[in-house]
Amino acid sequence: MWSSIENMKANLHKIVLDVHEDDEEEDDLHKYGSANGVSNSDRRNSSGFRSVSRYSISNGIESPAHHEIERYKAEIKKLQESESDIKALSVNYAALLREKEDQISRLNQENGSLKQNLTSTSAALKEARTDISRGSNNYAIKGNNDQSPNRLHKSVSHLKSPNHMSNGKGKDTDSFIKEKDLADMLEDRTKSMAAVQATELAKEREKLRDFQLSLQEERKRSESFKEELESMRLDKNKTSMEISKMRSELDAKLLEIKHLQMKLTGQESHAIGPGMEHLKEVNKALEKENNELKLKRSELEAALEESRKLTNSKVFPDATESLTRHPSTLDKEKPESFPGKEEMEQSLQRLEMDLKETQRERDKARQELKRLKQHLLEKETEESEKMDEDSRLIEELRQTNEYQRSQISHLEKSLKQAISNQEDNRLSNDNQIRKLKDTVDDLNQKLTNCLRTIESKNVELLNLQTALGQYYAEIEAKEHFERELAMAKDELMKLSARLKDSDERLESSNKEKEDVTSKLLHAEKVAAEWKNRVTKVEEDNAKVRRVLEQSMTRLNRMSMESDYLVDRRIVIKLLVTYFQKNHNKEVLDLMVRMLGFSEEDKERIGAAKQGGGKGVVRGVLGFPGRFVGGILGGKSAELHANAASDNQSFADLWVDFLLKDAEERERREAEEAAASKAKQDSERTRQEAALHDSEFSTVPLRSSESNQRLSR
């Protein structure tokens, strides 16, 4: 209920603000219609539209005329924008017209000055006419015959018939025609002179172009010769560098060859010398051993022969031959034949073994000698091959050196010839360049003289052409400005017609505004009726509060009498609800207060810490539990008599009532907190809106006391 009333209040306040802003807009429009002013109305209307858009109805009941008001305001805004555009266009056209008028006045002044200049020039022409006619009569006649025969015919006809015009007007026209003819003659003469000079200049320019082309070709040739000289110098430097490199390489190769020869000789001396000496020593040692072995063998053979002879001569004189023939058969004979035979055989065996070893050593020495000889031969062949290769390399290097020397000499000769040719070409080029420079200087002098004469003639032509061009330009500018004036007048007529249409539209919009204001007045009347109803409801609430206070005082008095009486049915119901609701804190708090527990009992139960806050019994208008218990204990018989017929008893109903009342009170407190927050937010928005629209604020509809009353 309270939220709907607040929404109605906010909507009515917005409607009132819109109505006041519409009144301000109408005043501004009337001012605009009276004095053709746009800035004030635009500013007011823009603020009005901002306020409307700011106060968009979102919370409660929308007024039926709100959309129509917005639509009308949008149309009014469009009309005002079109009016502002029309006014800006009119201002721009007025500025353009002023500029055009200023330009026309300037052109008139320039025309007057040109007329004065023409009069002065005509006087000067009259004075110089006699001189010009004497000096250049024949040339002017020729030019007129070639270029403008019609003009000559006209001038002659005018000169031959002076007597036809007898009045003053005829004389004036004759003088004007003569001046025109003279001006035409001067123009023809200047044009013919300019054409002749132009042809001469063209010829001279062609000659200059030819000379310049020849100069450019000679410069290109000289540059090409210079490039060739530079290339020849570079080639010479390259060849000299190559020759120096080849000489350095030859010196390095000769040094390497010398080092190789030295190394070869040293290696031969180092490798062959000790090998040969070692072989010689080994050979000598082997020869000595061989001689010693031969001597021992000969001695042993002699001793053997002597011993054989002795044995054969004593025991077996016929066996000497068999021993000499078959010495190996001695082993087969019995050892008992000769007592020193075994020792002799052993010594012979030893000697044979020594001989075999010496033979083996001799063979080994011979093999080593053969191997060393072969090795020496191989080394000699390798060294000879190396020497042959070195000699070949030396010969090849000598041949290359000779070939390079011949090339160097040939290149030096060609360089000398090229240098001499270059010097000759340079001298010839220098002579040609000098001649060309002289010719160029002469041509430049001629060019400067011709250009000076051309410039002087061009200045004269330009002066005459500028005078004529200014005259024709002024005439064309006048015609152009007249056309623009006509166009501007047509556009002004169109803009005035548009302004009339916009005024008619404004009148229709004003009528629609009046209809909207009548609807707003009706809405204000409805709001006043709602205010009266709200005041009546507030009075009824005040009466109900007074009755409640009286009943509360009575209940307090009754509770003092029945303070220690509680109905057992209430106690039973409290216990049952406590266990049913899983030891609810609120039910326990209610039991503690209704039964009047002491501090020790509370500590035993554990309700001392849980006390405080929003209890169930406080939900019933804020009275203690003992008071409620006293009431029920004092009137237990009456309650028992008036109990319902169904299963629920009065105690059950009473406890349910207390719990429901507590829940309702908590919910009410939450709603009140939310309403207070919303109220604070709305008040902030209103304050911001009031600060923002302080320029266009109106007198408030109701006082602050009524607003406070409605918020309560």
UniProtKB/Swiss-Prot annotation:
The lineage of its organism: Eukaryota, Viridiplantae, Streptophyta, Embryophyta, Tracheophyta. Residues 36-49, 135-150, 696-712 have a biased composition (Polar residues). Residues 328-344, 678-695 have a biased composition (Basic and acidic residues). It is found in: Golgi apparatus; Endosome. Residues 65-134, 197-313, 340-558, 659-690 form a coiled coil. Keywords: Coiled coil, Endosome, Golgi apparatus. GO terms for cellular component: endosome; Golgi apparatus. Residues 557-608 form the GRIP domain. Residues 23-49, 135-176, 306-347, 666-712 are annotated as: Disordered. It comes from the Eukaryota. PANTHER family: MYOSIN HEAVY CHAIN - RELATED, THYROID RECEPTOR-INTERACTING PROTEIN 11. This is Golgin candidate 3. It comes from Arabidopsis thaliana (Mouse-ear cress). Interacts with ARF1; preferentially with the active form of the protein.
